[in-house]
A protein has these predicted regions:
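Short N-terminal binding/cap micro-motifs at the start of the first secondary-structure element
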Residues: 25-27
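Ferredoxin-like alpha/beta domains used as RNA- or RNAP-binding modules
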Residues: 1-13, 20-21, 30-64
Length: 64
């Protein structure tokens, strides 16, 4: 039986992602954390590690 991967398994801390939707479309971010529903991402300019952006994982694409 295959286990469902959790959000933190699919997007580990440090994962580079590109925003696919929203006003930040095509911007690059680093995943800083995740919970059951959202990724928390930072770019070091507007969104820092201490104040990350909350992002729907359906609107994020893995880069590496």
């Amino acid at each position: 039986m295959m286990k469902n991967k959790t959000l933190s398994d699919r997007y580990p801390k440090g994962q580079l992602v590109r925003s696919r939707q929203g006003r930040d479309q095509n911007k690059l971010y680093i995943v800083t954390a995740s919970d059951d529903q959202f990724l928390y991402v930072a770019n070091g300019v507007k969104w820092t590690v201490s104040n990350p952006k909350r992002k729907n994982p359906l609107h994020a694409q893995k880069i590496n």
